[in-house]
Amino acid sequence: MSHQTGIRANEQLAKVFGKAKNGKFRVIKVSIENEQLSCGATAETKKDWERDYDKLIGPLLEKDVPCYILYRLDAKIPLGYSWLLISWTPDTASIRQKMVYASTKATLKTEFGSAYITEELHATTLDECTLEGYRRHKQDFAAPAPLTSREEELKELRKTEVHTEINTNTRHQTLGGINCPLSEATVAAVQDLVRGKHDYLQFRIDLEEEQIHVSRAAKVELADLPKQVPEDHARYHLFLFRHTHEGDYFESYVFVYSMPGYSCSVRERMMYSSCKAPFLDELAALGVEVVKKLEIDSGSELTEAFLQDELHPKKILHRPAFAKPKGPPNRGAKRLTRPTAED
């Protein structure tokens, strides 16, 4: 879910936005100064939008300082001209700046008029802010979304599945999970998590009682998350992952099921595996919207890059072609056959 700050446009910027609707301006630079959205610069239309693009946008960008760029295109919509919103957030900017700009983008769109903004571009390098970078973005955006490994499996399964006639005599075999009850402390900890008191919870299953208990509730930094995963026992983990992606700020609940290989007993592995789905249903009933479910062997897997890739898979525009496998090494020389001469 995306969150907003209380930052609003100042009076000067509001006036600029009003004048922009008549097509006078080609570009408007917006910065956050003194907890307000402020007008950093404007430039009027000179030629067509493509020839103006690099000449007008490039000089407005500072290497280490984020900003928003509103760029007027030449295409018309019922309200007037369509606009491109560029969120310039360089990698060298501070984390606080990245968070503030990501959280304020929705407010900027509302202040300017969301209906006028027909395209958006999130840029972290100066190259992405060029006309060529914009064209690459358009090409990438038009590509189909990548499939997860699970979706790929389902796609292949549908190609080969056999359609069977179903009638009243058809029998179905199902295997449901084990619904382990939650302790009172566990329910209270989840409710505190939803209220914002914690951002990390760890749960264990009491194998004798067959009940789920909370074993840790705390505010944990992402860098310390791997240390929370035990090396000798299975656990469930619930983490509120605060991050930015393409200029937007997200707070996403990530559920992690950690199972450290075969160091656990067979019963422990079976209990954690069987209780997982019903436990997730219980979390949903308590108001926790789990965005991603993960299974890991070791806490070292829980890095920011790993979580970003899991929540926001990167598009793969071209699949690599696999080389033809080599034949057996001792295949022998080729055998030639000569046609028999006919008398």
From Swiss-Prot:
Superkingdom, natural source: Eukaryota
SUPFAM superfamilies, per database record: Actin depolymerizing proteins (SSF55753)
Start and end residues of each ADF-H domain: 11-135, 184-312
Residue ranges of the region described as Disordered: 319-343
GO cellular component, as recorded: actin filament; cell cortex; cytoplasm; myofibril; plasma membrane; presynapse
InterPro entries: ADF-H (IPR002108), ADF-H/Gelsolin-like_dom_sf (IPR029006), Twinfilin (IPR028458)
Pfam families on file: Cofilin_ADF
Localization: Cytoplasm, Cytoskeleton; Cytoplasm, Cell cortex
GO process terms (BP): actin filament depolymerization; barbed-end actin filament capping; border follicle cell migration; chaeta morphogenesis; mushroom body development; negative regulation of actin filament polymerization; neuromuscular synaptic transmission; positive regulation of neuron projection development
This protein's UniProt keywords: Actin-binding, Cytoplasm, Cytoskeleton, Repeat
GO MF terms, alphabetically ordered: actin binding; actin filament binding; actin monomer binding
Subunit details: Interacts with G-actin; ADP-actin form.
PANTHER family, per the entry: TWINFILIN (PTHR13759:SF1)
Function: Actin-binding protein involved in motile and morphological processes. Inhibits actin polymerization, likely by sequestering G-actin.
Family membership noted in the UniProt record: Belongs to the actin-binding proteins ADF family. Twinfilin subfamily.
Name of the molecule in the record: Twinfilin
